[in-house]
């Protein structure tokens, strides 16, 4: 239930109403992960250089921390998008199964009515 609650709040917070919007959000988040991961990699490489001024070192470390926090959030968002997509497919399958069961029940009732209707006519 907690997972469903998180998914609901995620969809609400990001104003996602359709599967297409969910896919678009996920793709954007994945692309952002790629971009800022590369930025973080470059900053970490810069940290290894000798003779960097102390102020620049602090700026780099601060930015790496910011990127790491953003990456954590984006990765969680991507996981949520994947979980929501799976859940929506499961719900769609269950709805299809339910509809099939209901249709069979309606057909069974019609068949019974036809049988009973024929016996009354004789």
Residue ranges and their predicted role:
Residues 1-122:
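Extended intrinsically disordered terminal tails
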